Swiss-Prot record:
GO biological process per UniProt: isopentenyl diphosphate biosynthetic process, methylerythritol 4-phosphate pathway
InterPro entries in alphabetical order: IspD, IspD/TarI, IspD/TarI_cytidylyltransf_bact, ISPD_synthase_CS, Nucleotide-diphossugar_trans
Pfam family, one: IspD
Gene this protein is translated from: ispD
EC number: 2.7.7.60
Sequence similarity: Belongs to the IspD/TarI cytidylyltransferase family. IspD subfamily.
Site-annotated residues for Transition state stabilizer: R15, K24
Provenance organism: Chlorobium chlorochromatii (strain CaD3)
Name the UniProt record assigns to this protein: 2-C-methyl-D-erythritol 4-phosphate cytidylyltransferase
Length: 253
């Protein structure tokens, strides 16, 4: 399979409360930056042939240097992000289209991922890519742990309680057959219609397209607030311990 990854890493992380508009993707977990962990996972996924990353203009040299030092050979382009996340993804799609015209090769699927989700695993990337090609679209999600309620007509009071059994919390990478995602972004740009994730674009412009749910564990968190760093360090240690245990078991067998 020929899969392409788009990584959105343009956010300034207001909720992270970083000084001087710092970039949350450059925060360290386990001695390595968040974006390093993210890039490494896609580098190690066999189906991923090319990676496109959108970031702030001033961060482009830093990302390129990091990728070179970490041997991220699949990083095809680092492009300037847009005003909104959707604009950043669209900038990457346009770069993919340029490469397609030059090479004559269209990726089978495109996976769109948040740069601030450092714990996606290569085997999960592979499965999402496979399901995206099979069904046309696939989005990872987790079951909510908390009860979720609507806000009432008076915003200071609750409305109805939602059935938790019919709810999921959506994550990334979200995978789509290439033409589906490209056309959804083209139509959204033409209409000036914005959403917070790519699945919503497909739902709007291709309502007949079913989106496969890929249920995930709770490790694939998005680094958003200062508290997430503490949680991320614990997840990193757990993943490291599991990896070492797996390696030792394989050596003993």
């Amino acid at each position: 399979m020929n899969a392409t990854a788009i990584i959105a890493a343009s956010g300034i992380g207001k909720r992270m409360k970083l000084a001087n508009g710092g970039c949350k993707q450059m925060l360290e977990i386990g001695g390595f930056s968040v974006i390093y962990h993210t890039l490494k996972a896609f580098e190690q996924a066999p189906s991923i042939h090319n990676i496109y990353l959108a970031t702030r203009a001033e961060s482009i040299p830093l990302i390129q240097e990091l990728a070179a030092s970490a041997n991220i050979g699949k990083l095809t382009a680092v492009v300037e992000g847009g005003k909104e996340r959707q604009d950043s993804i669209n900038n990457c799609i346009k770069a993919i289209e340029v490469k397609r015209h030059q090479s004559g090769v269209t990726p089978d699927v495109i996976l769109v991922h948040d740069g601030a989700r450092p714990f996606i695993q290569p085997e999960e990337i592979e499965e999402i890519a496979r399901l995206s090609l099979l069904f046309g679209a696939c989005v990872p999600a987790t079951r909510p742990k908390d009860t979720i309620k609507f806000i009432g007509h008076d915003p200071e009071f609750f409305g109805e309680t939602l059935d938790r059994n019919r709810l999921v919390q959506v994550q990334t990478p979200q995978g789509f057959r290439s033409e589906l995602l490209m056309q959804a972004h083209q139509q959204a740009e033409a209409e000036g219609w914005y959403s917070t994730d790519d699945a919503a674009l497909v739902e709007r412009f291709f309502p007949q397209q079913l989106i496969k749910i890929f249920e995930m564990g709770y490790h694939n968190i998005k680094i958003t607030t200062p508290e997430d760093i503490l949680v991320a360090e614990a997840i990193y240690q757990q993943l490291q311990a599991h990896g070492n245990a797996t390696s030792e078991a394989a050596s003993a067998s």
